């Protein structure tokens, strides 16, 4: 993947993140998939937030399962960072929808399909990305 990233994308990926996003990526780097959750509303949120968007209370962290269902996907033929084509996807995991890369042929993917979630380190950015692998 070296050399495929335009300078503008590098600047975007390395920009200063808020504390909740930094904590999310730190946890991913430690092998934990987590989201923020309001104890009062009992609602998990992603992207992670310091305060609940519904009631404004501070949020804590909850670990998410490593399985979910494919919510949406699309093929990006001119990928900015990935070997083209990349299959960008959203997966429903517990109460949240997470972004990632679908791992499998586009033609074999189905909305609602069960997926397991793998954490994949990205050496160019130092971040860990989510990969959705069809389960079964």
Language-model features, listed with the residues they occupy:
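Conserved hydrophobic positions within beta-strands
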Residues: 68-70, 102
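Well-ordered alpha/beta subsegment
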Residues: 5, 95-136
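Residues immediately within or flanking Cys/His clusters that coordinate Zn2+
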Residues: 32-35, 49
């Amino acid at each position: 993947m070296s050399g495929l990233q335009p300078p503008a994308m590098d600047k975007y990926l390395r920009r200063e993140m808020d504390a909740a996003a930094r904590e999310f990526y730190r946890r991913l780097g430690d092998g934990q998939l987590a989201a923020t959750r309001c104890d009062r509303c009992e609602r998990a949120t992603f992207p992670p937030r310091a305060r609940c968007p519904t009631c404004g209370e501070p949020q804590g962290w909850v670990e998410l399962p490593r399985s979910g269902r494919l919510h949406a996907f699309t093929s990006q033929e001119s990928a900015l960072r990935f070997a083209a084509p990349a299959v960008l996807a959203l997966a429903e995991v517990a109460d949240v929808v997470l972004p990632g890369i679908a791992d499998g042929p586009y033609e074999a993917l189905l909305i609602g399909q069960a997926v397991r979630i793998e954490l994949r380190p990205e050496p160019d950015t130092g971040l860990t990305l989510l990969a959705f692998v069809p389960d079964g």
